[in-house]
């Protein structure tokens, strides 16, 4: 038995995240229609770790070029793969993580488009990103929904809709 586990809250939070899948699909579909070159999962700390999970998930199943980028490292060294056609996905509870804000500005200056899951939609980061979705918690699920839609649109995940219908 798990102490202090609230099953009702857990189910509600997952269902809430699944409810934004239509918004995620709309954004990813728009990006796919415009064309893109690669996908970068940007973060620092826990968000970077979530990005690594999404990148590994995609590398296992997709030919789409993807990687996880540590915001602090990017601000120090840059990355020549980031530019026109790069799609950056990030997430932030506060919307004010200095390293992520700086990295997003630099990536956009290089030509990247940014999808941000920013919990507080009035913050600097929420205003910076090209596509903003505000929903707290379930960062990994949100990232996986983005990854899965890109793979589905690339003809690599035909069972995507059926899988999410089961959730």
Model-derived features with residue positions:
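Helix-loop module immediately N-terminal to the HCX5R catalytic loop
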Residues: 12-28, 67-80
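Cofactor-/ligand-binding subdomain signature composed of acidic, glycine-rich
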Residues: 1-26, 151-165
């Amino acid at each position: 038995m798990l102490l202090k586990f609230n099953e009702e809250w857990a189910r509600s939070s997952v269902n809430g995240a699944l409810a934004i899948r239509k918004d995620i699909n709309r954004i990813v579909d728009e990006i796919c229609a415009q064309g893109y070159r690669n996908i970068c999962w940007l973060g620092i700390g826990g968000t970077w770790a979530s990005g690594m999970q999404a990148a590994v998930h995609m590398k296992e199943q997709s030919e789409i070029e993807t990687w996880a980028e540590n915001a602090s490292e990017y601000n120090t060294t840059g990355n020549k793969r980031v530019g026109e056609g790069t799609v950056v996905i990030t997430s932030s509870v506060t919307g004010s993580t200095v390293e992520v804000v700086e990295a997003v500005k630099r990536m956009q200056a290089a030509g990247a488009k940014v999808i941000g899951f920013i919990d507080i939609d009035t913050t600097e980061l929420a205003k910076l990103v090209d596509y903003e979705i505000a929903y707290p918690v379930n960062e990994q699920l949100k990232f996986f929904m983005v990854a899965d839609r890109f793979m589905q649109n690339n003809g690599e995940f035909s069972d995507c809709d059926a899988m999410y219908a089961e959730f």
